[in-house]
């Protein structure tokens, strides 16, 4: 797997940029983008270090992912799913919700720490505790 180059701006360019802007700049796909084109409201393609989802958001994310990529991952270590919302309820609709993430994890060989089973921990704590969230990383989320 070839990972994209993540280049943070030098001190001169970083001057006047927020920390968030520096992270987005570093993760942009189009390295030819000028500083003048990089501004609020611009549409950019970025490389994400991690694409986390909970059992609540995973079905929607997986559906969109499959539409865009045809179901092929660039790097399975970019995807992470935590089951912490719809577990232990005994409801069929909740089981259906979590089964989508389980099937995705199986197809793409996602295991711990990238796939958290019920009881492993709460989404927002689990991934950082597992060392998957690092300073300067670009990690989009639904909430």
Task: Go through the PLM ranges and name each one.
Residues 1-142:
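Fe-S-dependent hydro-lyases/dehydratases of central metabolism
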